[in-house]
A protein has these predicted regions:
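Active-site helical microenvironments for divalent-metal-assisted chemistry
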Residues: 1-170
Length: 170
């Protein structure tokens, strides 16, 4: 079925590792990162009573599905060409999904890319914030030299709209 095919594609994120290590010393998967930012959206729903936090949670769950096709490329190494390739492959896959999922995902991805709504801004802030938290939880011996400086500022602009998220990032 179309549903099983879509789930099979998404299952690839379980085996797609990210740059960051877990506190247990192994590489984190993209699926784990997506799960945790969705959990963060659930935990923080009362911090943003005017926002549609169910939509934020959906954004968090789907935000890295493009990495099913390209793998994870760390933010510090991702080029405009990498982003373009990932987006093209993702949108091609989304177009193959059954309706109404196809339309909802396309709408969510467009909103996430524009970063104009509060929901998109919250999702993006949580995405960056989770990466900072994950790095802080991992053994510092797993860090690359350039990450020490990057960790000091990564995601600051994304959380600046929210005093709560700014404080959490500190």
């Amino acid at each position: 079925s179309e549903l099983l095919a879509a789930l099979h594609t998404a299952e690839k994120l379980k085996d797609t590792t990210r740059h960051c290590y877990t506190s247990g010393g192994r590489h984190e998967s993209v699926a784990e990162h997506s799960w945790r930012i969705a959990l963060m959206a659930f935990f923080l729903r009362d911090e943003f009573p005017e926002a549609d936090m169910d939509k934020v949670t959906r954004m968090c769950l789907i935000h890295d599905l493009g990495e099913c096709f390209t793998g994870d490329i760390p933010a510090f190494g991702k080029t405009a060409q990498d982003e373009s390739t990932e987006e093209a492959l993702l949108y091609q896959w989304v177009a193959s999904l059954p309706s109404p999922c196809r339309e909802e995902m396309r709408t969510l991805y467009d909103e996430m890319a524009a970063l104009e709504t509060q929901e998109a801004q919250i999702y993006k802030a949580l995405d960056k914030l989770e990466a900072v938290i994950s790095h802080n939880e991992s053994d510092i011996s797993t860090w690359e030299d350039h990450e020490y400086d990057l960790q000091l500022t990564y995601g600051e602009q994304n959380v600046a709209f929210s005093p709560y998220l700014t404080a959490l990032r500190q």
